[in-house]
Amino acid sequence: MDFLAPLSAVVLTYREVGGDALGALAEEMRKCAEELAKATPMFVLHTCGRVEVYLYGASEEEVARVAARYRRFAEGVKVLRGAEAARHLFAVAAGLDSMLIGETDILGQLEEAYDRQVKAGYTRGLLKTVVERAVRVGKRVRTETGISRGPRGLGSLAVMYVSRMLDLREASVAVLGAGAVGAGLAMELAARGVKRLVVLNRTYEKAVEVANRVGGEARPLTEEEVEKCLAECDVVFSSVHTLQPVIKRVPPEARVKVIVDLGVPSSVVPNLPVAVVKIEDLRELAEEYNRERAGEVEKAWAIVDEEVARLPRLLARRYVEEATSAIMAQAMAAAEEEGKRAGCDTAVLAAKTTVKRTLLPLITKLKEMAENGKAEEAAKLIQLLQEALQS
């Protein structure tokens, strides 16, 4: 039994389409998840450089419908299946598919998306295992190679870019957004010794958490507070993902000299009367560091490929764990029911103990079979057990 075969991915990145289209597509995929994930496990990854949907157990028709929704926004959509889909996700987690090779922001964004979608019930079952493994692979690559030495991500590049325009040590700086990218920006700016640092976020508690970490001020992300920051700060970084711009105008006599827009779609209206740095402006700087990291890329890919090869057995074991857990729960419930018929707690305990002693050796053997490349045989035995319990 090939536990990777049911995995599918629909992928569109910064290479095929601009940021505004990616932002609109991300909103469409959010709606898609609300509709589809009730029946089919799903994981959506949206960053400034990509919108990717991973499905487990989806039919060909379901995958085709998701891809068709992508094509409303752009061509160049890739549909990946099985090991190819897993390899792509692992490479993304490792930073191998990013504009800045080895960047670490993507790993934080992946974890945030995973946590959010597990809580929502979208990412579950064996797809949950695939995404968990991707996070581990990303961490392993960064531990065992030097692919992330230097700038951590686009936020780091943006700080470097702005530092060539003015002295950040004498600057008041605001960061809009306290997610993975915003928090990374705040840490980078604090390390550079900015004069004053303000962190804004829609969830105020998150702004407080990040601000406390870097010795900055926290504010809620409202239109009024954004305008105050533009009036008071020399530089404003925006890492907010929103369909509507959060910076709509520059107030008269505002202090702001530079706005950095890392939002997808753009979080800044066009034609503002100050310098606006966009993601595209960072490409040349990214390529400079990519050349320095080129020697680590082969090592990183070797880890990715090793982990992809291990994944089927991990999924097989997880499948057996989930299935046998359900069988044990069903058998224990039946034992409890029979024990209650005897009319005493001792009978209930005895029935449960007997069931556990009987099933545990079998469950252990099934797990060993799955780990040793006999997942298909283990699955057939599990199906027989399930049928027996239902009869």
Swiss-Prot record:
**Catalytic activity, EC:** 1.2.1.70
Molecular function GO terms recorded: glutamyl-tRNA reductase activity; NADP binding
Family as reported in the entry's similarity comment: Belongs to the glutamyl-tRNA reductase family.
> What does the UniProt keyword field contain?
NADP, Oxidoreductase, Porphyrin biosynthesis
One GO term of the biological process aspect:
protoporphyrinogen IX biosynthetic process from glutamate
Residue numbers binding NADP(+): 177-182
Record remark: domains:
Possesses an unusual extended V-shaped dimeric structure with each monomer consisting of three distinct domains arranged along a curved 'spinal' alpha-helix. The N-terminal catalytic domain specifically recognizes the glutamate moiety of the substrate. The second domain is the NADPH-binding domain, and the third C-terminal domain is responsible for dimerization.
- PROSITE patterns given in the database record: GLUTR
Provide the assembly information.
Answer: Homodimer.
Catalytic activity as recorded in UniProt: (S)-4-amino-5-oxopentanoate + tRNA(Glu) + NADP(+) = L-glutamyl-tRNA(Glu) + NADPH + H(+)
Enzyme category, top tier: oxidoreductase
- The catalytic site is made up of 48 (nucleophile)
In the UniProt entry for this protein, what further remark is given in the free-text comments?
During catalysis, the active site Cys acts as a nucleophile attacking the alpha-carbonyl group of tRNA-bound glutamate with the formation of a thioester intermediate between enzyme and glutamate, and the concomitant release of tRNA(Glu). The thioester intermediate is finally reduced by direct hydride transfer from NADPH, to form the product GSA.
| Site feature (Important for activity) residues | 88
What task does this protein carry out? Catalyzes the NADPH-dependent reduction of glutamyl-tRNA(Glu) to glutamate 1-semialdehyde (GSA).
Protein's UniProt name: Glutamyl-tRNA reductase 2
Q: Which HAMAP family match?
A: Glu_tRNA_reductase
One Pfam family this chain carries? Shikimate_DH
User: Which superkingdom does the taxonomy of this entry point to?
Assistant: Archaea
Q: Which organism is it from?
A: Pyrobaculum calidifontis (strain DSM 21063 / JCM 11548 / VA1)
Task: Detail which positions bind substrate.
Answer: 47-50, 98, 103-105, 109
Pathway assignment: Porphyrin-containing compound metabolism; protoporphyrin-IX biosynthesis; 5-aminolevulinate from L-glutamyl-tRNA(Glu): step 1/2
